[in-house]
C-alpha cells in the first residue's frame, strides 16, 4: 500500500484536559483503534477541528474524512470496517494510493488509473476499466458515502481549470452511478489547480497533479449499526 504522510499540528487546550491526537497518531494506530484514537468523549469535536485545519473548512479529501469522525467505541467499529474496505480497494486496483485516516479512506487515482481525453471530461477506456474494478467494492460497502474531487494542473486559466475539474469529477460520478451504485452516495467538487501534490513546472509534475481523489466516509446507516453493535 502506498502511503502519503500527513503533516498536521497537534491541537491543544480543547475541552479542558481532553487527550488529543495528531493525524500521524491516528494513522499509525492499530486497526480498530484508528477510530478510537480520535477520543471517546469528544471524537466528533476533535474531528471537526482537525478537518478544518486540513484546509478550506474540510473542503479537501483529507478534511472531509477527518472532519466526519464519530470517535469512541463506535468510531473503532467503523474504523475496522474501513480497514477491510481499504484492503479490498488496494487488491482491486494495485498501485493506487489508499490511505486510511481516522474513520475513513482517502483514495488518490492518478492519470495512470483514471484519465480523460485531452481538455475534456470524457473518460478513457483505461479509466473506465479501472473504475469497473472499484464497483464491486463500493457495492459491498454500500453504507458509505463518497465525495469525488477533481484536480488539474496549472496550465490554462484558473476558472477554466476549476470548471474542467468539476466536469471530470461529475463524469466519474456519472459513470459509477451507471454501474448500479446509488447516485445519492456521491457528491462532487472541482478543485481546479489547487492543492498540487507536485510542481507544475515539469511535465512529470503536471501529470501527477491531474488526478481524481475520493473521500470515503461512513453514512448514517453505518454509524447507527455501529452504535447498536457497541451496546451489545
Q: Regions from the language model: what does each represent?
A:
Residues 1-10:
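Bacterial N-terminal signal peptides that target proteins for export
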Residues 18-22:
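C-terminal motif of bacterial Sec signal peptides marking the signal peptidase cleavage site
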Residues 25-88:
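Short, low-complexity, glycine-enriched hydrophobic/amphipathic alpha-helices that associate
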Residues 82-113:
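Amphipathic, membrane-active segments
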Residues 87, 91, 125, 129-136, ...:
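Solvent-exposed, polar/charged alpha-helical surfaces in well-ordered, non-transmembrane soluble domains
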Residues 102-132, 152-159:
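Short, solvent-exposed beta-strand/turn patches at coil↔beta or beta↔helix junctions
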Residues 118-150, 177, 207-209, 214, ...:
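Periplasmic peptidoglycan-binding/anchoring modules of Gram-negative envelope and division proteins
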Residues 151-225:
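Periplasmic OmpA-like peptidoglycan-binding domain that tethers envelope proteins to the cell wall
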Amino acid at each position: 500500500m502506498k502511503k502519503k504522510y500527513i503533516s498536521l499540528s497537534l491541537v491543544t487546550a480543547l475541552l479542558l484536559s481532553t487527550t488529543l491526537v495528531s493525524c500521524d497518531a491516528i494513522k499509525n494506530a492499530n486497526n480498530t483503534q484508528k477510530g478510537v484514537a480520535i477520543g471517546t468523549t469528544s471524537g466528533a469535536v476533535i474531528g471537526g477541528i482537525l478537518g478544518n485545519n486540513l484546509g478550506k473548512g474540510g473542503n479537501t479529501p483529507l478534511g472531509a474524512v477527518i472532519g466526519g469522525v464519530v470517535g469512541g467505541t463506535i468510531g473503532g467499529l467503523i474504523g475496522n470496517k474501513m480497514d477491510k474496505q481499504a484492503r479490498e480497494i488496494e487488491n482491486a486496483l494495485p498501485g493506487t494510493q489508499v490511505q486510511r485516516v481516522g474513520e475513513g479512506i482517502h483514495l488518490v487515482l492518478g492519470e495512470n488509473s483514471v484519465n480523460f481525453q485531452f481538455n475534456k471530461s470524457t473518460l478513457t477506456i483505461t479509466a473506465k476499466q479501472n473504475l469497473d474494478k472499484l464497483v464491486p467494492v463500493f457495492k459491498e460497502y454500500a453504507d458509505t458515502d463518497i465525495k469525488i474531487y477533481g484536480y488539474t494542473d496549472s496550465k490554462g486559466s484558473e476558472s477554466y481549470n476549476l470548471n474542467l475539474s468539476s466536469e471530470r469529477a461529475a463524469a466519474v460520478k456519472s459513470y459509477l452511478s451507471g454501474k448500479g451504485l446509488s447516485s445519492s452516495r456521491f457528491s462532487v467538487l472541482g478543485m481546479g489547480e489547487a492543492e498540487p501534490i507536485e510542481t507544475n513546472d515539469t511535465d512529470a509534475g503536471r501529470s501527477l497533479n491531474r488526478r481524481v481523489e475520493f473521500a470515503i466516509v461512513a453514512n448514517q446507516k453505518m454509524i447507527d449499526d455501529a452504535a447498536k453493535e457497541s451496546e451489545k
